[in-house]
Structure formats: C-alpha cells, structure tokens
UniProtKB/Swiss-Prot annotation:
It comes from Pseudomonas putida (strain ATCC 700007 / DSM 6899 / JCM 31910 / BCRC 17059 / LMG 24140 / F1). The keyword Cell wall biogenesis/degradation does not apply. Residues 10-22 have a biased composition (Polar residues). Homodimer. One of its GO terms (molecular function) is zinc ion binding. HAMAP family: ThiC. Signal peptide: none annotated. The lineage of its organism: Bacteria, Pseudomonadati, Pseudomonadota, Gammaproteobacteria, Pseudomonadales. Pathway: Cofactor biosynthesis; thiamine diphosphate biosynthesis. It comes from the Bacteria. This is Phosphomethylpyrimidine synthase. GO terms for biological process: thiamine biosynthetic process; thiamine diphosphate biosynthetic process. [4Fe-4S] cluster binds at C574, C577, C582. Binds 1 [4Fe-4S] cluster per subunit. The cluster is coordinated with 3 cysteines and an exchangeable S-adenosyl-L-methionine.
Length: 626
C-alpha cells in the first residue's frame, strides 16, 4: 500500500457520489406492493403538466418508468455507503429453509485478506458471514421454478416488468402502439409470476440473484422480457480508487444500467468488489479469471484449477450474481484464430488460450465444468458463458472459431441446466449489419433459447471515439432479433478507461438501443413514454419533454443554450425554426383553421337541410303559382 492509501480510512471517510442521489425533476419514487408487505417493487413516476387551453386543456396522467437507481433516488432513504444498502431478500431466503450461515469465509484467499491488518482501512466494515446451500440442496431460481415454486423474486420481477399496465390501459395511455415483429419470441400482453416461473424453468430467462447479495432488487433477463443493458466498471493497474468505482456504480444505475460488471484488474480487487456489492441494488457480474491471473502475478501458465476454484468460492461468498466463464475456448479452436485480422481480443479468451497452448491440455474450465456447476448452485450464481473467441473486427465476424465456440457453449448450457443452474450466453463483438441476424439465429439454435448477452455488436471499425454509436446500431438490431441483454460500449472503447461522463454516454446510448428493440418487438406498453413525450412536444410543454426523456439534464441544457430565459419554457417555438417557421405551431394553426372551416361547413349543411325540408313540406314542386 502507498502512503496515501494508508492515510485513507474508507470506513470513516467514504461518501456517496452526490450527483447520483439527486432526485429526477418532477419525479417521485413509488413502490408497488406484492402479495406480501416485504415485496415492494420500485418504479419512477413522472408527473406531467396539464395540456394548455390552446390545445384543448386536459389533464395528463403521470407516466411510470422502469427504475434501476435503487434507494439512491428515494429522498426518504438516508444513504451511507460505509454501511451499504438495506436488506431486501434475506427474509425470503431464510423462509425457504435450504441455506445455512457459515461461521466465516471458506475461501483461502478471502481469509488471507481478512487477516491482513494493513487492509483494515480499505475494508468494508460491515461484512456478513456468508450463506451457502445446505448439504445436497440446490438454491437456484431455476431449481425452484422446475419444482413448480413461484419465489418472491419471481413475483417481484413480474410486477416490475408489468409496470402497472392495467392502469395504463385504463388511463388511455396504450391507445396507440404499433404492432411489433418479434421473430418468434412469445411476449404475453401481461407478465405474470407464473409466466416468469415457466420462462426460468425452460431456461429462456434468468434472475441473477446470489443468496449473498440480499441488497439486490430482483430483475430478469430473457428474450420475452424488456431488453436489459449492462454497464462495466472496474479499476486497472493504471488507476482508479475504490471510492471512484462505487461512484461509477451509483452513477451508472442512475441512468439505467440493469446490471453492472466489475472488471477490476488493478489493486485491491477483493476489497473493491465488497464495497461495490454492498452498495449495489442491481446484479453484479465478474470475470473470475481476471482475479485468478492477478494471484499468479499475471503469468497465465501458472493458473491452476485449485486456485480458480478458490476464487469462485471467494467471489460467490461475497455475493457476485453472475460469473463470466470462458469454458468454450477449447484447444482445437485456438489454431482457427491464427489467420484472423485481430486474433483473440477477449482478455479471458486469450488467458485460457495461452494456458491451453503452454500445457497442451484442454481448458480446465471445460474439463471441470460439472464441478463449477456444483459451486454455482450452492450460492445461486448464474453462468454468463464467455465468448472468448468473439471477433474483434468485422473482418473476423462469423468465422469458424467464433461459431465453433458457440456450439460448445450450447453443449455447456445443457450441462448447466442438468444441474438446474441458470445460464446466459455472451456474444460478439464486431459484426457488420448483414451478418447480425445470423448470429442471433445461430445462438438460438445452438443454445436452445438461453438468454443472449452481446457486446454491441459494433457494425464498423472506422470510428474510434464514437464506438458507442457504431455499437449502438448493432445493439438495437440484435435486441430486436432476440438478444436479452446488451453490454454497453462507451466513447472510450479501444482508447482508454472510461470516466463518469463516458459511463453516462454509454448507458444512455444503450438505453436508446434497448428501448428501440422493445418497440420493434411490440413489447406491451413500450410506446407509452414515446406517446407522452410526442404529445408534450406538440403542445410545447417543454418541461415535460425534458423530464420524460432518458436524460433530462442534457435536454434542458441544450434548449437553454439558445433560449435560456424561463419564458422560453412556455414559448410555442424553439431555436431550431424560430416563431414563424415552427412546424408544430403551423400545424396547430392549420388545425384551428380547419376547425373553423368545418364549423362553416356544418352551418351551410344545416341550412341546406332546412331548405330541403321546407321544399318537401311545400309539395316538392319546382315552381309555384304567383
């Protein structure tokens, strides 16, 4: 530890990122209660102004939006990152009666870190003893689902996905929605707890929720649900502190990150992860091979199954919800990458390829896969089967190495399911638009509809600094075709470690892609927010336009750059066209004129009817005697 690190006592000094706890404008946190009082599902309600009298003068119902920010945006909750978040799930877990509280950490590395006095000032102070399944028990959500049990977690996500659709229909918010094209997905008009159970039992969806992460607000990943996004954080050997990583977490979930992966490769990985999990209301994923490599000082050849197994247990006992495991990088696939333009670009994939070549043995993650499953089901950690041979350039897309690994991931998925372990599949990468559908179709075929989770894909390689856009295009497409979760890409992709602004930009880009996919699939209620914003735009309700957007702050700032006065917030024009050329204003004038013409036409028509009736009453004679 450096002198500076020794001087910092995080258990005393750590503070929440103040930007992350600011309430959203005209929004309030609401909770929808389930069948029991401790199932309280958070949503964000956006209040809207009334329609101006010029436009008919009606009240506008508030709009509910999916909320990933946890208690950080609830003004009634006092946030203290030194203590972590409140417990959400322990009562549900205890009631099932199939877990036990351990006397302490069971991983060798976890015990070493706990006994290192020098780390005391960096350590999260309120570490619980971990839980584990009782001997012979399986505590995965898939296992419960296959037993016909609807867990509290399943009910929770059903309420969360449904977003009070019945009330929205009653309020007329669903009167306008285009029919979607879902490419064979089976999206019901209403998400019920039983439907959630069926999808998890079938393997088409997962609820990543480790029994040692009781702070998590359950969410679901699957093609028949809302498309989710993941945001990456994590330190590197070149910098970033524990407090900065927690700030990235809280900042990311504020803007809509459904899950977060901690990809730390620098110092204090164990301690950083503890702080992140204890303060995270969303599932946390990791790539355990990264930390295992740090334990052997970066020498891939020195990795062993025993060391990796201890790392899995260490992280499972901390509460990691899903592991990326690169078990599909087989020895026979490595030569297939030799003629690629960019070779093996996955860090985990390259580590395992190097180990295989150095020992001329099969990947130990593959040969010990059943043993990994035993660990996963003891803590309910979900698999995210890593695509270690994903293409790193569009030239390498859809090649033999990529699809060979995908077929192996399909085999491993079926092994995981035999153990009732939840599983999703990671995908590319760099893929031109015309090859994206083939990726999705191949994954559905090989992996029997297990959820697909892709990094983009990037659709072109010519835009360093703008890869959030090149990948957002591919993300929207593959989300429409059936991908369940999209891993965000920031503007810093290929260039450097993202800062807070980059994280926000990446998340907003991917929220757009995910929402566009939901619209295209015809997800029930997906168009409510679009309709509300479009109506606000036509009626010049500027504040409602800002507040209904994914990023109210940026929308307001852009508007105020040219029209900063408060009077501009009620003006019937913006700086794009000015007062005389605003299409919305002209359209309203056309409507008013048409209404007047219609009124005149009605008067004329009424007069004509009266004259016709008089004509008939007078005998229907064309001429009358004088």
């Amino acid at each position: 530890m450096t002198k500076q690190e020794k001087a910092i006592n995080l258990s005393e000094s750590a503070q929440v990122d103040q930007q992350s706890v600011q309430p959203f404008p005209r929004s309030r946190k609401v909770y929808v209660e389930g069948s029991r009082p401790d199932i309280r599902v958070p949503m964000r309600e956006i209040s809207l102004d009334d329609t101006p009298t010029d436009f008919g003068g009606e009240s506008n119902a508030p709009v509910l939006v999916y909320d990933t920010s946890g208690p950080y945006t609830d003004p009634d909750v006092i946030i203290d990152v030194r203590k972590g978040l409140a417990d959400v799930r322990s009562a549900w877990i205890e009631a099932r009666g199939d877990t036990e509280r351990l006397e302490g950490l069971s991983s060798d590395f976890g015990q070493q870190r706990l006994n290192d006095a020098e780390l005391a000032k960096l350590r999260f102070a309120h570490v619980r003893n971990p839980r584990r399944a009782k001997a012979g028990a399986n505590v995965s959500q898939m296992h419960y689902a296959r037993q016909g049990i609807i867990t509290a977690e399943m009910e929770y996500v059903a309420i969360r996905e449904n977003m009070k659709l019945q009330e929205a229909r009653a309020a007329g918010l669903l009167n306008e929605q285009h029919a979607g094209h879902s490419f064979g997905a089976n999206i019901p008009k209403e998400i019920t707890p039983e439907f959630v159970r069926q999808e998890i039992a079938r393997g088409r969806a997962i609820i990543p929720a480790n029994i040692n992460h009781p702070e998590v607000e359950p969410m679901i990943i699957g093609r028949n649900f809302l498309v989710k996004i993941n945001g990456n954080i994590g330190n590197s050997a070149l910098g970033s502190s524990i407090e900065e990583e927690v700030a990235k977490l809280t900042w990311g979930i504020r803007w809509g990150s459904d899950t977060v992966m901690d990809l730390s490769t620098g110092k204090h990985i164990h301690e950083t992860r503890e702080w992140i999990i204890r303060n995270s209301p969303v599932p946390i994923g990791t790539v355990p091979i990264y930390q295992a490599l740090e334990k052997v000082n970066g020498v891939a050849e020195d990795l062993t199954w025993e060391l990796f197994r201890d790392t899995l247990i260490e992280q499972a006992e901390q509460g990691v919800d899903y592991f990326t495991i690169h078990a599909g990088v087989l020895l026979r696939y490595v030569p297939l990458t030799a003629k690629r333009v960019t070779g093996i670009v996955s860090r985990g994939g390259s580590i395992m390829a190097k180990w295989c070549l150095a020992h001329h043995k099969e990947n130990f993650l593959y040969t010990h896969f059943d043993e990994i499953c035993e660990i996963m089901k003891a803590y309910d950690v979900s698999f995210s089967l890593g695509d270690g041979l994903r293409p790193g350039s569009i030239a390498d897309a859809n090649d033999a190495a990529q699809f060979g690994e995908l077929e192996t991931l399909g085999e491993l998925t079926k092994i995981a399911w035999k153990h009732d372990v939840q599983c999703m599949i990671e995908g590319p990468g760099h893929v031109p638009m015309q090859l994206i559908k083939e990726n999705m179709d191949k994954q559905l075929e090989c992996c029997d509809e297990a959820p697909f989770y892709t990094l983009g894909p990037l659709t072109t390689d010519i835009a360093p600094g703008y890869d959030h856009i090149t990948s957002g295009i591919g993300a929207a497409m593959i989300g429409w075709f059936g991908c369940a979760m999209l891993c965000y890409v920031t503007p810093k992709e290929h260039l450097g470690l993202p800062n807070k602004d980059d994280v926000k930009t990446g998340i907003i880009t991917y929220k757009i892609a995910a929402h566009a996919a939901d619209l295209a699939k015809g997800h029930p209620g997906a168009q409510i927010r679009d309709n509300a914003l479009s109506k606000a735009r036509f009626e010049f309700r500027w504040e409602d336009q800002f507040n209904l957007g994914l990023d109210p702050d940026t929308a307001r700032a852009f508007h105020d750059e040219t029209l900063p006065k408060e009077s501009a917030k009620v003006a019937h024009f913006c700086s794009m066209c000015g007062p005389k050329f605003c299409s919305m204003k002209i359209t309203q004038e056309v409507r008013e004129y048409a209404a007047k013409i219609e009124a005149v036409d009605v008067t004329v028509e009424q007069g004509m009817r009266e004259q016709a009736e008089r004509f008939r009453q007078e005998g229907s004679q064309l001429y009358h005697k004088v």
